[in-house]
Amino acid sequence: YFQNWQMAQLRAFANEQHQQEALHGHGHGGDSDSNKKARAGLCGVLRERKVVELARAKRRLVEVPYTATLANAANALLAGRVSAVTVAAPPGHWIGAGGSLIVESDPATGAARKHYIGMVNMLDILTHIAETGHDDDDDASAVKDGGGSPPVDLDRRMSVPVSSVIGHSLEGLTLWTLHPNTSLLDCMETFSKGVHRALVPLESSADNVVAVELVESAPVYRMLTQMDVVRFLRAHGAELGGVLSRTVRELGAASEAVLAVASRTKVIEAIRTMRAASLTAVPVVDAPMDAYPGTAALFVRQGRGKKVVETFSATDLRDCPVAQLRSWLGASVAEFKDKVAEYRRDGSRPLDAEEEPPRPREMVTCSFQSTLGEVIEKAAASHVHRLWVVDGEGEEEGLLRGVVSLTDVLRVVREAALGEDRELHDIVSS
């Protein structure tokens, strides 16, 4: 049943034409319209544009039925090349994540066809494995990982229904929707508070525009992410004014509290640490493990001031083939990264238009002196959700000083827009 479901989705993805006009600013009146928006100011631009414009450019949802196993969900993430999958169930039998009631309805009759009960990402799946990794400690064939063992009976762990891991990560606790007529400014408020993605109905049954909703019924939904909004900002840089030329330090866009792992940290321990801190990525730093006695969890509090060499993220976890999970989770982060890179180079995974073909991933960093425009360009071009802030010269070149996430980018752009708007009102009223 699941294979038929998955194949039907993949065929739909292959046949669907990706409409990129909304993300690249075409089809909205040309230069004269752009000039009008520029005169309206940054806040005016972000208030005028609606999330449905971006959502229409997105492909169909990647989803799995509530009966799918964790192995099915992991394969769907890999095949669809997405960070999260929605979980669908028959209507009337479930309470959605966070008490949500998001229903796909029949376009002709309005009758409910399916209920989206939550989202699951690879970190949710691997967290489930990590948390239950000590259940089989008495098994003589346990795989040693230096600080805890992945379960020997991985097949049993991966055969549980995907619905059982909804909400394992902080992001999965609630399933959000945005009304299609929500302005980008209001969307950015939601996305600047830690919400990474939300469902957007292309048509809504709700009369009143409420930016964030837990109840919705619509024939078609699309997934809108923080990256979609950042790409919009990149494509419309000329309309955003001076905020893009301001520095990371000036805008307060960086957080200096950074957790990190050593390259020799075991993957299973890194996953536990990421789950405990609600992180989807951590920097990997060049430091000997014996310099930090105890487990990796003691080390990760010492990230600032160490030389960052690469990133360990949910994307790496997603690209780990299910068949290799047992052996790869016991490897060090550095070994795991090498294995994933080799798997990508082999072209063993199917390609889809949402992301570019596999290529060696380079470190994506910035400094406190980098402009916001440079940060947005790097994030969008490299499809990364955070840039590590490093020192840029001398003996301290490459030392970790902080992190700028997409959440930070959207927060400071929104704050700049509202600040500019207040100044304009003060001038008019004076």
Report residues per predicted region.
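Tandem CBS (Cystathionine beta-synthase) repeat/Bateman regulatory domains
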Residues: Y1-S430
